[in-house]
Amino acid sequence: MKITLVKKVLADGSSCRKCIDVMGKLEQSGYIERIDEIVSADEKDPDSPGMKLAREHNVDRAPFFIVQEAGQPSRVYTVYYQFVREEMEP
């Protein structure tokens, strides 16, 4: 399983407030160690890796998680607690 976290970078270069909050929760819980990749969706760069992933998965908010397993469709989570409940805790 591969887990990707997409964080938003605002036009002024700062991280979005919700992204900072989710990163704190991931670090505090220890779940950050299970995240394989963290990419940025830069508002100033529509070709940034995170913006491309957002378009590919039809997501219009950040942060979001993409969970990939071989032979299965990707699962996308835009709600932190749902992601934790369904992917981290089972």
Regions found by a protein language model. Give the residues of each.
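Thioredoxin-like thiol-disulfide oxidoreductase module
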Residues: 39-61, 88-90
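Non-catalytic, surface beta->alpha helical segment in thiol-disulfide oxidoreductase systems
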Residues: 67-90
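Generic alpha-helical propensity signal that fires on short helical segments
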Residues: 21-23, 53-56, 77
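Broad hydrophobic/π-residue packing in well-ordered secondary structure
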Residues: 6, 57, 78-80
